Amino acid sequence: MKKYEPLDISGDVGLKAYGGTIDEVFINAAVGMYSLITNINLIEEKKSIDISVERSSIEDLFVSWLNELIFHFDTYGFIGKRIEIESSEFGVQSLEKHPTLTYKISAKIYGEDFDSTRHESRLLIKAATYHKLRVQKINDIYEAEVIFDI
């Protein structure tokens, strides 16, 4: 199973991520997003950052997760290569919205500060959006699709 693939959207760029678990989808979407920004094979694991996000739906959590990673890139220049989920809570096993449930994810992101002399600049991603957003389970595979503003 492939981990992610870019989606060609007129005027924007999208990403489709896959996983055997919802955690894997979050990891693969983040790595896929980083690969749209630069060649992640050139990223070294020189430092790590901790990310924690909590929202009231799986869709909100997914978009907020990616936007938090974009924030760390835009603000601090940090670009990730490897992600370890430290904890996650997705309410019940259903991916339907339940306003009383909490959806959380905490992870350690390993990477380094972006260096334009060593790292290729591909796309400047401004934000993950809700446009055509999908997070779902199809048979035994979790999938997520997201469109980015560039």
Question: What does each model-identified segment do?
Answer:
Residues M1-I150:
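Intrinsically disordered, low-complexity regions
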